[in-house]
């Protein structure tokens, strides 16, 4: 997803475009990995001195509810990234830098076979480790 796609989603849901929202979205697009709210606040503070965590978190939750960003817990902290594809997939997440790699394989079909009679409504699979760059 790019910034324009995200802005389109905001507008389709009756939400207004603001420079702050665009700048937050730009951070996600540029980073393309899991980042925490503190990092977003630090980057945003350069153009919006004194921007509050409330503003950051309010927009993070809005973006998440609209499917613009994804979230995960890494090292006991909530982190966020831009939604990367429209197809079903999972992620490998580097525990050191937060970089992600798409895993196109999904084990849910095999799991469904071992759970006859149940309806699975949703699932999430994340694989954690250390990426090639961080192993050096």
Curated annotation (Swiss-Prot):
Keywords carried by this UniProt record: Cytoplasm, DNA-binding, Iron, Metal-binding, Repressor, Transcription, Transcription regulation, Zinc
A family per Pfam: FUR
Gene3D superfamilies: 3.30.1490.190, Winged helix-like DNA-binding domain superfamily/Winged helix DNA-binding domain (1.10.10.10)
GO biological process terms on file: negative regulation of DNA-templated transcription; regulation of secondary metabolite biosynthetic process
Main location class: cytoplasm
Subunit structure: Homodimer.
Protein family membership: Belongs to the Fur family.
This protein's name: Ferric uptake regulation protein
The organism of origin for this protein: Staphylococcus aureus (strain NCTC 8325 / PS 47)
């Amino acid at each position: 997803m790019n910034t324009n796609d995200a802005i389109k989603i905001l507008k389709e849901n009756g939400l207004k475009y603001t420079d702050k929202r665009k700048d937050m979205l730009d951070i996600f697009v540029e980073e393309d990995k899991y980042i925490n709210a503190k990092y977003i606040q630090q980057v945003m503070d350069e153009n919006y001195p004194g921007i509050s965590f409330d503003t950051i978190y309010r927009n993070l939750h809005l973006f998440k509810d609209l499917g613009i960003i994804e979230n995960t817990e890494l090292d006991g902290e909530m982190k966020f990234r831009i939604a990367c594809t429209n197809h079903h997939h999972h992620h490998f997440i580097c525990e050191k830098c937060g970089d992600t790699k798409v895993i196109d394989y999904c084990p849910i079909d095999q799991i469904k076979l071992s759970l006859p009679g149940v309806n699975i409504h949703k699932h999430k699979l994340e694989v954690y480790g250390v990426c090639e760059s961080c192993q050096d």
